[in-house]
Amino acid sequence: MRDSEEVPGIDREPLQGDAVHLADRIKEELDLLARNVDILEKLAKSPPIGIIRLSEALELPIHKTRYSLHLLEREGVIQPSADGAVVTDRAAEFWSSLNRSLDRMTELIEHLRSRAVEHQSRPPSGRKGY
């Protein structure tokens, strides 16, 4: 998923003033995760590849590619080499952990969606304040 793609069901209108939807912040983190996954997949399928070729192959700005490479290296799933970044043995552990995390997030999202639908169908209570 590219940064410009929209996630269905997330209203993009800001709250009053400069307030930001909590869902927008979560979506930004998911966009970053998706970019990291794209990069890790590309590195796993390719021989060592440098940052410029990687950016071009994934149609990403170099600064975003560099940041994702930094995060993946910090996690220990890639390491630099003379020819570019390479995937380490810890990648398998990363994929397992990601799958578990996504399962937990999916459960939480389904729970939140059911609560949001429930509240959306209720008439306002008319109460003011907290």
Where do the protein language model's features map onto the residues?
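Short amphipathic alpha-helical interaction segments
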Residues: 30, 59-74
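Long, compositionally biased intrinsically disordered regions
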Residues: 1-12, 83, 129-130
